[in-house]
Amino acid sequence: VQAYDANTAKINVVQSFSVAQRGTITALTDGTTVTPDFAAANNFSLTIGGNRTLANPTNLTAGQSGVIVITQDGTGSRTLAYGSYWKFASGTAPTLTTTASAVDVLVYYVESSTRITARLIADTK
């Protein structure tokens, strides 16, 4: 007989699961520089109201993956720059869809404490 604790998820340690887990989507606070806390969630949303920088997140753990849903405000034409940990295909950062209220999805995978591989799915409708 296993102890009760052996099969119980914990909230204060990193764990691996053999079945799907679901978390809430955490809203990021819009500002000149947006710094996600990757300990807070895997999936995020962000409505940008100006040209912004998505800074290197805090609390990176290799193996974490998720999405950041980025929405242009009602004005649009907003741009997004990226911190040095963000890595994209061919070394080129993607350009957001600039239409007012456009939605792009940034999919990411944390490789290490200083490297995040990401891909932008543009203009999702």
Q: Residue ranges of each PLM-predicted region?
A:
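Acidic, glycine/polar-enriched metal-coordinating patches/loops
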Residues: 3-7, 46-125
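Transition segment at domain starts
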Residues: 23-42
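The right-handed parallel beta-helix/beta-solenoid scaffold, focusing on the short coil/turn
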Residues: 13, 32, 42, 52, ...
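Fibrous stalk/shaft segments of extracellular and virion attachment machinery
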Residues: 1-26
